[in-house]
């Protein structure tokens, strides 16, 4: 607040001094208003401004925190997390995530989205529509139903014992 008033005073003082040559163009009332603003700033004691700021600070109070309620919410979230960890679908998703992380950390030769070989197949993690989009040693895995294709897309994955690439071999 003090800074703003000082800045306003400096600007007004500059304008009053800079308008010396332009007095003929400016109306006398405008110059009078600027001089009154400068006088008002000079008359305002800084102590009253500090008192106003202190009063505003006293009025502001931080919201009270109910620590008991917060602790019970944290406990509920922890219990839900434990329940989710036991869910078989979550375990599958975790296994999938770990597999993907291992493949990425292992320094796969091909980044997702880059063609492999002679542009005949796509790397692990790349979106696919069927097994023919993926390499022969991979398969196209769709984790969700077809109506959620846009939300959870199919991707090329490492072929496991129960999954096989059903694309006919290239000639």
Swiss-Prot record:
GO CC terms in record: extracellular region
Role this protein plays: Has antimicrobial, insecticidal, cytolytic and cytotoxic activity.
Residue ranges annotated for the Oxytoxin-type inhibitor cystine knot (ICK) domain, each copy included: 118-171
UniProt remark on domains: The presence of a 'disulfide through disulfide knot' structurally defines this protein as a knottin.
A single MF term (Gene Ontology): toxin activity
Protein name per its UniProtKB record: Spiderine-2a
Compartments reported by the entry: Secreted
Organism, as annotated: Oxyopes takobius
Source superkingdom: Eukaryota
Residue span of region Linear cationic cytotoxin domain: 59-104
Tissue: Expressed by the venom gland.
Disulfide bonding pattern of the chain: 121-135, 128-140, 132-167, 134-156, 142-154
């Amino acid at each position: 607040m003090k800074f703003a008033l000082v800045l306003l005073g400096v600007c007004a003082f500059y304008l009053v001094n800079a308008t010396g040559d332009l007095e003929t163009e400016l109306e006398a009332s405008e110059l009078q208003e600027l001089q009154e603003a400068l006088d008002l700033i000079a008359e305002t004691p800084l102590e009253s401004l500090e008192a106003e700021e202190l009063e505003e600070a006293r009025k502001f109070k931080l919201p009270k925190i109910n620590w008991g309620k917060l602790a019970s919410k944290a406990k509920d979230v922890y219990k839900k997390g434990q329940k989710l960890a036991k869910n078989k679908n979550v375990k599958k998703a975790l296994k999938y995530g770990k597999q993907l992380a291992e493949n990425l950390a292992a320094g796969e030769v091909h980044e997702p989205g880059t063609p492999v070989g002679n542009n005949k197949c796509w790397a692990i993690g790349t979106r696919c529509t069927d097994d023919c989009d993926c390499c022969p040693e991979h398969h196209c895995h769709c984790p969700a139903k077809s109506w959620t294709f846009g939300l959870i897309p199919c991707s090329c994955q490492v072929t496991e014992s129960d999954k096989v690439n059903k694309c006919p071999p290239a000639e």
